[in-house]
């Protein structure tokens, strides 16, 4: 979703929310939570508050009037009834034959509500320095996580990674082959953004930074002499991330055309730009997702930017055999989340042995 449209929709949701949700929004914006995350959370709150009113658990006539007392006194059975409602309500997708929403969606809803309840019962302070209330019903609600072993995850994900020579082959495909599949009109559009698109893909493959971190990069955050980028990690922490040397020529090529191609002025600090009605704007996450999907589908298999992050992590572990180094590169506090890459590499080694 375009940033301007995203902010417009956020304002629409804020206009119907209770005052304490607006306080929550402001607090999380300072962390900072991404606008995308906050937008998704506001959608979940709207759905929850509408259910409270429809179920007569709140006597409010509108969402903005749902009071704190209602949230404080909701029981575990009430929350379980809400989960059951999510499971059994008709799907909003008219093309879907499924009844209810997926477990992933339910988990996202519960995560949003847990975040709100934690804020109201632990983080916020009233005029007496106390939270608004103390009873957190969300701590009693169990979530069902998708059961899948690391080996199964590795098997599912490795087909969507560009390992070994495929990393450079993918970049070469975008650079030298992709446009020959296009019409003359499509070629003109491709050539306009070719250097930028290659720079984005190269940076993701060479650093493993998250999509949101790439989107939010400013010019001052990129040091091509040191091959470092400064990013804001989850939780608002700043981090310096090393970038592999193969990305440098692509980043330099983009910078050489950035000013003239996108009409960038001094105040346009975003590193990756797009032209909207002739004016430079920071590129948004959805544009990068579509771009990566389009190129990767033509090359091998349609993937997301997050799979490029997995690609870097797997290649780095394959080279170093160090989970600590990989976790530092990805910005993880623990090596536990890097266990996946050991399984992928071990599978690749086994496949290589089978060919001997």
From Swiss-Prot:
Its main location: cytoplasm. One of its GO terms (molecular function) is tyrosine-based site-specific recombinase activity. InterPro entries: CB, DNA_brk_join_enz, Integrase-like_cat_sf, Integrase_catalytic, Integrase_recombinase_N, Integrase_SAM-like_N, Recomb_XerS, Tyrosine_recombinase_XerCD. Residues 16-121 form the Core-binding (CB) domain. The active site is at residues 210, 234, 306, 309, 332, 341. It comes from the Bacteria. It is found in: Cytoplasm. GO terms for biological process: cell division; chromosome segregation; DNA recombination. FtsK is required for recombination. Keywords: Cell cycle, Cell division, Chromosome partition, Cytoplasm, DNA integration, DNA recombination, DNA-binding. Residues 169-354 form the Tyr recombinase domain. GO terms for cellular component: cytoplasm. This is Tyrosine recombinase XerS. Belongs to the 'phage' integrase family. XerS subfamily. Signal peptide: none annotated. Site-specific tyrosine recombinase, which acts by catalyzing the cutting and rejoining of the recombining DNA molecules. Essential to convert dimers of the bacterial chromosome into monomers to permit their segregation at cell division.
């Amino acid at each position: 979703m375009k940033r301007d449209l995203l902010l417009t929709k956020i304002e629409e949701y804020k206009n119907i929310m209770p005052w304490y949700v607006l306080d929550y929004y402001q607090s999380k914006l300072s962390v900072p939570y991404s606008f995308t995350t906050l937008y998704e959370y506001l959608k979940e709150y709207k759905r929850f508050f509408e259910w409270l009113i429809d179920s007569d658990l709140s006597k409010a006539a509108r969402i903005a009037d749902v009071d704190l007392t209602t949230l404080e006194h909701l029981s575990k059975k009430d929350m379980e009834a809400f989960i059951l409602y999510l499971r059994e309500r008709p799907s909003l997708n008219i093309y879907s034959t499924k009844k209810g929403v997926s477990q992933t969606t339910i988990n996202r809803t519960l995560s949003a509500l847990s975040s709100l309840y934690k804020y109201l019962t632990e983080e916020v302070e009233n005029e007496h320095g106390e939270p608004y209330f103390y009873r957190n019903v969300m701590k009693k609600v169990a979530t069902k996580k998708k059961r899948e072993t690391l080996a199964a995850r590795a098997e599912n994900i490795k087909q969507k990674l560009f390992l070994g020579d495929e990393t450079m082959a993918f970049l070469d495909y975008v650079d030298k082959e992709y446009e020959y599949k296009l019409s003359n009109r499509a070629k003109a559009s491709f050539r306009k953004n070719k250097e930028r698109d290659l720079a984005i893909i190269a940076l993701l493959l060479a650093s493993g930074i998250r999509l949101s971190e790439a989107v939010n990069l400013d010019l001052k955050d990129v040091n091509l002499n040191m091959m470092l980028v400064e990013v804001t990690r989850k939780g608002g922490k700043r981090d310096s991330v090393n970038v592999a040397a193969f990305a440098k020529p692509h980043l330099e090529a983009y910078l050489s055309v950035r000013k003239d191609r996108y009409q960038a002025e001094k105040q346009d600090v975003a590193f990756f730009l797009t032209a909207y009605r002739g004016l430079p704007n920071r590129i948004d996450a959805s544009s990068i997702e579509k771009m990566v999907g389009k190129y990767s589908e033509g090359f091998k298999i349609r993937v997301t930017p997050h799979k490029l992050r997995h690609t870097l992590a797997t290649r780095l572990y394959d080279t170093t055999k160090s989970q600590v180094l990989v976790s530092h590169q990805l910005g993880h506090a623990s090596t536990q989340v890097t266990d996946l890459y050991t399984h992928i590499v071990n599978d690749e080694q086994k496949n290589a042995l089978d060919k001997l």
